[in-house]
Structures are given as structure tokens and as C-alpha cells.
From Swiss-Prot:
Keywords: Ribonucleoprotein, Ribosomal protein, RNA-binding, rRNA-binding. It comes from the Bacteria. GO terms for molecular function: rRNA binding; structural constituent of ribosome. One of the early assembly proteins it binds 23S rRNA. One of the proteins that surrounds the polypeptide exit tunnel on the outside of the ribosome. Forms the main docking site for trigger factor binding to the ribosome. GO terms for biological process: translation. It comes from Campylobacter concisus (strain 13826). SUPFAM superfamilies: Ribosomal proteins S24e, L23 and L15e. This is Large ribosomal subunit protein uL23.
Amino acid sequence: MADITDIKTIIYTEKTLGLQEQGVVVIQTSPRVTKNSLKAVLQEYFGVTPVRVNSLRISGKVKRFRGRAGQRDEIKKFYVKLPEGVSLENTEA
């Protein structure tokens, strides 16, 4: 089961700010987090039960640095639809 330390950040871009107007929050996590474990973390720490959770896995790109190949970290993003009138900003953690 995941815990609050597996949630890395809430993503703020032009696209996600538009989604926030519709009640959707985009959360970046470690790849081992599942939909059910994220729902449990949101319920336990924020007191919010999400309406819907969609996930997206992004594999790490291979990048070159000083002539050597390296790889970026793999991440997972969740699109979390919150109940109407609820946001993660106005909840206490």
C-alpha cells in the first residue's frame, strides 16, 4: 500500500489549470502507486473521496550526458476527479 510519501507533486500547467476548473487534479507519483492505494491515501490524509481516478504511466527517456547514456526516472500521473465544490488546496493535511 502506498502512503503520502509516494505522492511527489501536484502538477500545475496550462492544461491542468484548465482541468482544475472542471474539478480534476493531476498528481505525479512513484510508479508503484495504484488507483486503489491513491484513493486510500486521499481519503486518509485529505478526507476526500474521489469520484474517478485515471492513471497514466510515463516511461523514462534515455538521455545522453557527457557522452554516456543515462535514463530519466519512470513516473506515474493520476487524473483525480474530485466531488463538486472540493479541492485539495482547501483541505488540511
